């Protein structure tokens, strides 16, 4: 069993940093437990994770077919010309619970052989369609 078989998507800030949206309801993030459950993916790729960089502080995924909510507070990396002078930062709430607090993003997230995505100061907010049906609603963007 791998969690993408139960749903897999994500939201990308500036096209470079992914917060994973996937069905990991009821999975235990303790390493001993996920090995026993025959999971193929580690918790830093589970729902609510900053993909490949950091697992959520708590698995806040609701049961399948429940609407999930995410609130993201994101500050892009800063650059002086081509030189990065400060890392991006993100705070994430899932279903009303803080799961990442002011996490510093040392590099873009990425999966597969291409590795981390390039970091940029500005870019789109994108949503991933990754093999499973997914729906989004009530999307808000507030510039700060």
Question: What are the functions of these language-model segments?
Answer:
Residues 1-144:
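Carbohydrate-interacting regions of secretory-pathway proteins
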């Amino acid at each position: 069993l791998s969690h993408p078989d139960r749903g897999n998507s994500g939201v990308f800030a500036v096209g470079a940093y992914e917060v994973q949206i996937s069905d990991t309801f009821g999975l235990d993030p303790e390493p001993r437990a996920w090995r026993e459950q025959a999971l193929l993916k580690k918790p830093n790729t589970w729902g609510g994770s900053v993909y490949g960089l950091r697992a959520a502080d708590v698995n806040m995924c609701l049961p399948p077919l429940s609407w999930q909510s995410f609130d993201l507070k994101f500050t892009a990396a800063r650059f002086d010309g081509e030189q990065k002078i400060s890392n991006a930062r993100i705070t994430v709430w899932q279903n009303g619970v803080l799961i990442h607090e002011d996490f510093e993003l040392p590099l873009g997230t990425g999966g597969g052989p291409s590795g981390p995505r390039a970091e940029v100061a500005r870019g789109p907010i994108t949503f991933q369609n990754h093999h499973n049906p997914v729906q989004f609603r009530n999307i808000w963007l507030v510039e700060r």
